[in-house]
């Protein structure tokens, strides 16, 4: 996802969307694996399914990498929010004493 698009969406919403895409990708991968193992296929059909399987595995891997990055970004944002809250609390406590 491009940086500009990432700025327009909340990180949590992006994570939710990406998790859904990853889930769908895994379901599709299971379906392809099932078709590969359950039927007697022609060599051409088998190659096609193997290609689709590799494509889905690459897509799932990319989604997992992106999720890892987004979760790290989300963690940094949360820590920054907590730090700002603590700082404001300390300033308020100092000011009111």
UniProtKB/Swiss-Prot annotation:
Its main location: membrane. It comes from Homo sapiens. The keyword Membrane applies. Keywords: Coiled coil, Membrane, Transmembrane, Transmembrane helix. It is a single-pass membrane protein. The keyword Amino-acid biosynthesis does not apply. The gene is CCDC167. It is found in: Membrane. InterPro entries: CCDC-167. The chain crosses the membrane at residues 78-95. It comes from the Eukaryota. This is Coiled-coil domain-containing protein 167. Residues 10-79 form a coiled coil. Pfam families: CCDC-167. GO terms for cellular component: membrane.
């Amino acid at each position: 996802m491009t940086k500009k698009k990432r700025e327009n969406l909340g990180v949590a919403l992006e994570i939710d969307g990406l998790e859904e895409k990853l889930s769908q990708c895994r379901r599709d991968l299971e379906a392809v694996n099932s078709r590969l193992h359950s039927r007697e296929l022609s060599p051409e059909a088998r190659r096609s399914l193997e290609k689709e399987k590799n494509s889905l595995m690459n897509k799932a891997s990319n989604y997992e990498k992106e999720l890892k990055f987004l979760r790290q970004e989300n963690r940094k944002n949360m820590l920054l929010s907590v730090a700002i809250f603590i700082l404001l609390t300390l300033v308020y406590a100092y000011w009111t004493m």
